[in-house]
């Protein structure tokens, strides 16, 4: 029996984001295959996760492509909050969808400092949510993604993208 990535908790999210980053750099899902790199399978077939379909991957990929050129990283606190809200409150994206309900505003109030600058960048990047169609079969997907993203925001993994502890310490110039 094949072990599913979601059973590992937020590690499935890490793999998903890494895949999306790789996929956006290469130009599309047809450039990479799950077997040997010979363009044999598409996004929908690479991930055997129940409820995860191509529209979910595409939506996350669009979010990542919009934040990266503006010096925002998906691991930043504000970016995590926005991604969680975007994936969790799909009523803003899909008001006609029967499986979602209305939620509060997608962006928090403005705050001073670095966090305020990040919020301003995100507010400029996402003035209105893009319309993406979701059917009843994808309702489960939004809830799972939202739950995992909320868990990642609350309990981020330490050390994955961080610099090694020796970087910047005790450097000797030649």
Curated annotation (Swiss-Prot):
Residues 88-113 are annotated as: Disordered. One of its GO terms (cellular component) is cytoplasmic vesicle. Residues 1-29 form the signal peptide. It is found in: Endoplasmic reticulum; Golgi apparatus; Cytoplasmic vesicle, Secretory vesicle lumen. Pfam families: RESP18. Keywords: Cytoplasmic vesicle, Endoplasmic reticulum, Golgi apparatus, Signal. GO terms for biological process: in utero embryonic development. Coiled coil: none annotated. Its main location: endoplasmic reticulum. Belongs to the RESP18 family. PANTHER family: REGULATED ENDOCRINE SPECIFIC PROTEIN 18 (PTHR17314), REGULATED ENDOCRINE-SPECIFIC PROTEIN 18 (PTHR17314:SF0). May play an important regulatory role in corticotrophs. This is Regulated endocrine-specific protein 18. The lineage of its organism: Eukaryota, Metazoa, Chordata, Craniata, Vertebrata.
